[in-house]
């Protein structure tokens, strides 16, 4: 297998990795490597769960593996795994800029620290990563890195995969982006000798993240304080609740509902939540996915078409009312990579304010 790392000078892209497509035999070997690795991690990660829960989680993993084999993306995952490892060895995190944070395979391979099953299997929606059974798609493998590790990437990939047989006339591509927070977090880790993990986040960190989000999207200090005090009364914080708040603020100008609706079960702040509700009301997965991705952004005649689609499946009135109000939604997996870095930064702000202030 051959690799080529292109550098796009003059813009934010570090450059894309191009690699020659492995032969069918090599692809099958890669798939087996990932399957064995994931099954090993599965047994260790969820041993505290009940036997029934373990079977459900195993079914979720097998569903992803089936999609991975169908889309022939095993080497995408293995290459992303090596990029994450070489970054971590150099003291820098990576940032998933696509939707890999929603993948169990990515979590088991160490590409992301976020477990997409941590809030329950009922809130895990592989359709946003892999599409539906009738319309399968590949994940978005865009990865953010610190510029310091770019020189190590080609060397690492060549040493790891140079012996893999491939078709030298066909190339696949993985986009890489230069991300400032990867560099900052690596520098903070080196200066403090500490590297936080998601298990280290507590209420102080989450409160700091919420304040940072508010501070970044509003100008008047008095308004910031009022909103911060209001939101503290609405919900308690964990990673999932902060994720919902972050998604809400990203779309704060795209609907008219107040912050009080964050605890309203009929108010959806992510595509995942809206999709789950549609499917629960017997809207087919393909149709529901189209509505939450394209329907919420549609206008005019196209919007009317989606309204008729909802009426066709006799969804409750509150869903139609919600749909009439929203014009855009983010999916959770698109927000996770960004939010993880916000939490890492907030952790340093709380525990090493002097070092953070010097770098910010």
Feature map (PLM): residue ranges:
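Noncatalytic, beta-rich nucleic-acid-contacting surfaces in large DNA/RNA-processing enzymes
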Residues: 3-360
């Amino acid at each position: 297998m051959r690799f080529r790392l292109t550098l796009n000078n003059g813009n934010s892209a570090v450059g894309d990795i191009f690699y020659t497509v492995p032969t069918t035999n090599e692809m099958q070997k890669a798939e087996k490597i990932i399957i064995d690795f994931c099954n090993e991690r599965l047994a260790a990660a969820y041993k505290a769960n009940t036997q029934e829960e373990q079977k459900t989680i195993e079914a979720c993993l097998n569903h992803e593996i089936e999609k991975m084999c169908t889309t022939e993306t095993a080497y995408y995952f293995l290459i992303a795994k090596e990029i994450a490892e070489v970054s971590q060895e150099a003291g820098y995190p990576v940032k998933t800029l696509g939707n890999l944070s929603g993948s169990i395979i990515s979590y088991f391979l160490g590409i992301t620290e976020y477990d997409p099953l941590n809030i329950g299997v009922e809130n895990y929606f592989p359709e946003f990563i892999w599409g539906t059974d009738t319309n399968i798609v590949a994940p978005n493998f865009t990865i953010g890195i610190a510029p310091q590790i770019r020189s190590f990437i080609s060397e690492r990939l060549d040493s790891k995969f140079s012996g893999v047989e491939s078709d030298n006339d066909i190339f696949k591509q993985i986009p890489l982006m230069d991300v400032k927070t990867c560099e900052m977090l690596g520098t903070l880790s080196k200066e403090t000798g500490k590297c936080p993990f998601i298990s280290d986040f507590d209420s102080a960190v989450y409160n700091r993240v919420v304040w940072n989000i508010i501070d970044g999207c509003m100008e008047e200090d008095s308004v910031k304080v009022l909103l911060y005090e209001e939101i503290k009364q609405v919900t308690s914080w964990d990673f999932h609740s902060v994720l919902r708040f972050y998604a809400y603020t990203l779309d704060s100008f795209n609907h008219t509902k107040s912050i009080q609706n964050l605890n309203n079960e009929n108010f959806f702040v992510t595509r995942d939540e809206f999709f789950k509700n549609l499917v629960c009301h017997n809207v087919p997965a393909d149709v529901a996915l189209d509505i939450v991705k394209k329907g919420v952004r549609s206008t005019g005649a196209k919007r009317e078409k989606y309204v008729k689609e909802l009426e066709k499946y006799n969804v409750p009135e509150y869903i139609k009312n919600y749909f009439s109000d929203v014009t855009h939604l983010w999916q959770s997996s698109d927000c996770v990579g960004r939010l993880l870095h916000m939490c890492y930064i907030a952790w340093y702000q709380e525990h090493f304010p002097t070092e953070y202030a010097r770098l910010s």
